């Protein structure tokens, strides 16, 4: 039985006051939040400490949107997993399309980060997805295949229990244009097939890993999406920054 995971990515949004106030409101709403799901919030790095403190001891996991794969060292502007641990942060998002597109993050750098994090007992939410141009030129599966094969290269079978995947078609992010359930299902199925092909015995892992869909997810479309066989949750951007949507989404 795969776990249903709903993750909220606040990206580089909200002032400190807004982020902390949203965290307090989420805490109050926890009784209304669906049971039996894993809920995660990813505030900006600057707000991690404050949000993690507010949600400490609750069922909501607080995660980081990025990390540098090193212990404490001279990497100006970066954050070490060691520093995240101190805050009680156990989940890190890797490979979000905004980092790939605007910050030049490659599959191989994602792979380095994933190795480092899994070795240090973090849960990793690894994001993949094609751009509109890639989809329109018939490259969707080729792109996803490289992101899976290169991003997850050399990951040991026993570490997969700490991995969650997210499929986010870039053309559906923040555009209001949601992938149809059939479009999302087709790619989620493909992702599972790619994972099954990673190494001998990976078929079982592919069946048990949670794959979230991201791209304009809202309370009014999440249920339809979750009806698809290979969709196990949502990675929510815009809607996760509004408290009103929490009871319907998380
Ligand atoms: O990480 C979240 C995604 O990029 C989706 O963002 O829900 O605003 O489309 P969105």
Curated annotation (Swiss-Prot):
GO terms for cellular component: cytosol. It catalyses: D-glyceraldehyde 3-phosphate = dihydroxyacetone phosphate. Its EC number is 5.3.1.1. PROSITE patterns: TIM_1 (PS00171), TIM_2 (PS51440). Disulfide bonds: none annotated. Pathway: Carbohydrate biosynthesis; gluconeogenesis; Carbohydrate degradation; glycolysis; D-glyceraldehyde 3-phosphate from glycerone phosphate: step 1/1. Substrate binds at residues 9-11, 174, 216, 237-238. Transmembrane segments: none annotated. Its main location: cytoplasm. Pfam families: TIM. InterPro entries: Aldolase_TIM, TIM_sf, TrioseP_Isoase_bac/euk, Triosephosphate_isomerase, Triosephosphate_isomerase_AS. It is an enzyme of class 5 (isomerase). One of its GO terms (biological process) is glyceraldehyde-3-phosphate biosynthetic process. The active site is at 96 (electrophile), 168 (proton acceptor). Homodimer. Involved in the gluconeogenesis. Catalyzes stereospecifically the conversion of dihydroxyacetone phosphate (DHAP) to D-glyceraldehyde-3-phosphate (G3P). Belongs to the triosephosphate isomerase family. This is Triosephosphate isomerase. It comes from Leptospira borgpetersenii serovar Hardjo-bovis (strain JB197). The gene is tpiA.
């Amino acid at each position: 039985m795969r776990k249903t995971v709903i993750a909220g990515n606040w990206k580089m949004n909200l002032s400190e006051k807004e982020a902390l106030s949203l965290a307090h409101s989420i805490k109050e709403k926890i009784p209304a939040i669906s049971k039996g799901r894993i809920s995660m919030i990813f505030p900006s790095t600057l707000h991690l400490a404050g949000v993690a403190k507010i949600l400490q001891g609750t069922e909501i996991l607080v995660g980081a949107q990025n990390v540098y794969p090193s212990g404490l060292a001279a990497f100006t502007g970066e954050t070490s997993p060691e520093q995240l641990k101190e805050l009680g942060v156990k989940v890190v998002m890797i490979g979000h399309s905004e980092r790939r597109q605007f910050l030049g993050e490659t599959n191989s750098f994602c792979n380095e980060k994933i190795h480092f994090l899994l070795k240090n007992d973090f849960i990793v939410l690894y994001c993949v997805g094609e751009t509109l141009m890639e989809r329109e030129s018939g490259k969707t599966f080729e792109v996803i295949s490289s992101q899976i094969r290169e991003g997850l290269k050399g990951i040991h079978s026993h570490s997969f229990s700490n991995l969650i995947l997210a499929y986010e078609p870039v053309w559906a992010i923040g555009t209001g244009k949601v992938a149809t359930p059939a479009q999302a299902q087709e790619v989620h199925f493909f992702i599972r097939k790619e994972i099954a092909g990673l190494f001998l015995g990976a078929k079982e892992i592919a069946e048990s890993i949670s794959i979230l869909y991201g791209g304009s997810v809202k309370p009014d479309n999440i249920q339809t999406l979750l009806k698809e066989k290979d969709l196990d949750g949502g990675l929510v951007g815009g809607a996760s920054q509004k408290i009103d949507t929490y009871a319907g989404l998380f």
